[in-house]
């Protein structure tokens, strides 16, 4: 049996009305409430999920969400909240949801942003921990998916390979491969959709970044990358060296050092590290007389404004902020500790991301002698450990290569428009989410100087607004279109290694709005939330 919503036939594109949607028979309780009834405002036929069809027939959905991580689940929740009349499918390349928070399983994994701004705006963070561990975040994401009945919309082991736009049909034809099938000869799955929302993250899930170290094959111990932490790795009473000084390294060090015989964090150069309270000081006082949701909103906006103040201070008075941060570290470690060598970076604050440590756990590990920081360059690996250019030898049983990520733009999807390949590096970014001259496609990309989710949440709501306008006016496409010539500026004002290594795969950034990527949440909140009906330089058809 097919469950079909009917629309004005004059507005329907020329497609098969028989559409395969899933691979198991539909039950009555499989059909969500919002599929009941007849609509006439949208130019698409929408067929319910979970309906078996012949293999050669293609399925059609209104919105195809790529990725079931933090951004993908949050975006789908916003679709359910704001556009319940739209059909959608979530394609996830991995076997489970959660994205980063399921993939990374190294000891002590936690957020490097406060959870009041990292959580969804529509789902208050009620845990007392301002910096949460990975398992708690994963539980939060999956709880949101349960609350909004998303799980039956998710297809796991489905990787998007390419997407072809047809200006005749005003639809995307998306090619998907599956990694859970027995046959290597199975043809790719074809899905057609009205709009693509890419929430696939910004890095390569399959492989982290590891520099080429001389002699690494000579090392007789274990070498691990945090992105693929061995489940059975035993480090108790072992000598461990952690290479790196970013968020992953400063998370690993205090946790692992509780059990290791010795632990050295080996860094080429220092990073700014900031102590933050594990529990927000306003939580208990406000919680005595305000509802939890009100407390959440208050602390969330307090955190937003504080983040922006610190970032703006780093741009306007970098020396003053630098001095403040370094003095705070001296207070933690004492004036006898060599802060100049190990905790004084050679760049200004927020040229790279600040690393937050809750309740001084990193500094406590150093004070208590459980961990040591060595600032030096690697000459080569040898059978016993690492030889440094200073001549020092670091013997180790385990070396953790916490050297960063490999960026991957848009999930490596090959886009084409009317059979012409799209080079995304030649396209300009529109409002931090769409690309010039590419119709009906948006990317969910967060901030580098603030919590990631603040921007992805705004993006999802803005896309819902676009789709509502299209439905209301009978449009079938929306395309960012550059009206006047403009200059080009770097897309990310950020000197992190993983960003610099990926400059050649990034799209362009204009020197004027709405083509200039914004790094200020309050400004985006006004432009995308409060003024969401003002769609300058968008072409609707």
Predicted regions and their residues:
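Extreme N-terminal leader/targeting segments of oxidoreductases
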Residues: 2-63, 81-86, 207-227
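C-terminal catalytic lobe of FAD-dependent flavoproteins
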Residues: 325-327, 331-384, 388-410, 490-541
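Feature captures the FAD/FMN-dependent oxidoreductase FAD-binding
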Residues: 130-203
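Core beta-strand elements of the Rossmann-like FAD/NAD(P) dinucleotide-binding domain
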Residues: 61, 184-195, 236, 389-398
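Rossmann-like dinucleotide-binding core of oxidoreductases
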Residues: 55-60, 64-65, 70, 75, ...
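Short beta-strand to alpha-helix junction loop
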Residues: 125-143, 313-321, 349-361
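Beta1-alpha1 glycine-rich phosphate/pyrophosphate-binding loop at the start
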Residues: 15-19, 24, 29, 33-34, ...
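C-terminal, flexible cofactor-proximal segment of oxidoreductases
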Residues: 16-19, 23-39, 43, 249, ...
């Amino acid at each position: 049996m097919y469950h079909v919503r009917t629309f004005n036939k004059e507005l329907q594109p020329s497609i098969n009305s028989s559409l395969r949607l899933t691979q198991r028979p539909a039950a009555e309780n499989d059909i969500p409430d919002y599929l009941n009834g007849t609509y006439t405002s949208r130019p698409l036929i929408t067929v319910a999920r979970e309906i078996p069809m012949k293999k050669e027939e293609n399925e059609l959905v209104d919105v195809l969400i790529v990725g079931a991580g933090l951004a993908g689940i949050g975006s789908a929740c916003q679709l359910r909240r704001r556009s319940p009349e739209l059909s959608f499918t979530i394609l996830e390349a991995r076997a489970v949801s959660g994205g980063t928070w399921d993939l990374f399983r190294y000891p002590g994994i936690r957020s490097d942003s406060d959870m009041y701004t990292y959580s969804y705006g529509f789902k208050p963070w009620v845990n007392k921990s301002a910096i949460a561990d990975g398992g708690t975040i994963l539980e939060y994401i999956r709880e949101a998916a349960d609350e909004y009945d998303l799980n039956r919309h998710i297809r796991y082991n489905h990787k998007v390979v390419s997407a072809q736009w047809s200006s005749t049909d005003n639809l995307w034809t998306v090619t998907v491969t599956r990694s859970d099938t027995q046959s290597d000869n199975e043809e790719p799955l074809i899905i057609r959709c009205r709009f693509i929302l890419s929430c696939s993250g910004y890095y390569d899930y399959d492989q982290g970044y590891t520099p080429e170290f001389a002699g690494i094959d000579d090392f007789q111990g274990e070498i691990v990358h945090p992105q693929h932490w061995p489940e059975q790795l035993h480090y108790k009473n072992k000598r461990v060296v952690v290479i790196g000084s970013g968020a992953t390294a400063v998370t690993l060090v205090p946790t692992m050092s509780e059990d290791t015989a010795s632990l050295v964090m080996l860094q080429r150069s220092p990073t700014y590290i900031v102590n933050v309270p594990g529990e927000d000081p306003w939580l208990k006082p406000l919680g005595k007389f305000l509802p939890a949701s009100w407390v959440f909103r208050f602390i969330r906006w307090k955190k937003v404004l504080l983040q922006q103040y610190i970032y703006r201070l780093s741009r306007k008075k970098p020396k003053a902020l630098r001095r403040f941060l370094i003095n705070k570290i001296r207070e933690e470690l004492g004036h006898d500790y060599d802060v100049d060598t190990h905790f004084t970076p050679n760049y200004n604050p927020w040229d790279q991301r600040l690393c937050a440590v809750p309740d001084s756990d990193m500094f406590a590990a150093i004070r208590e002698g459980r961990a040591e920081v060595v600032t030096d360059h690697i000459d080569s690996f040898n059978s016993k450990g690492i030889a440094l250019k200073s001549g020092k030898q670091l013997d180790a049983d385990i070396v953790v290569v916490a050297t960063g990520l490999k960026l991957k733009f848009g999930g490596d999807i090959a886009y084409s428009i009317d059979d012409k390949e799209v080079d995304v590096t030649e396209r300009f970014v529109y409002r931090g989410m769409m690309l010039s001259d590419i119709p009906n496609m948006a990317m969910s990309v967060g901030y580098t100087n603030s919590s990631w989710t603040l921007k992805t949440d705004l993006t999802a709501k803005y896309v819902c607004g676009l789709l509502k306008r299209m439905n209301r006016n009978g449009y079938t496409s929306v395309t960012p279109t550059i009206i006047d010539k403009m200059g080009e500026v770097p897309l990310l004002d950020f000197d992190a290694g993983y960003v610099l290594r990926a400059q050649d795969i990034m799209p362009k950034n204009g020197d004027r709005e709405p083509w200039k990527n914004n790094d200020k949440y309050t400004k985006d909140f006004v432009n995308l939330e409060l003024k969401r009906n003002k769609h300058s330089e968008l072409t609707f058809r």
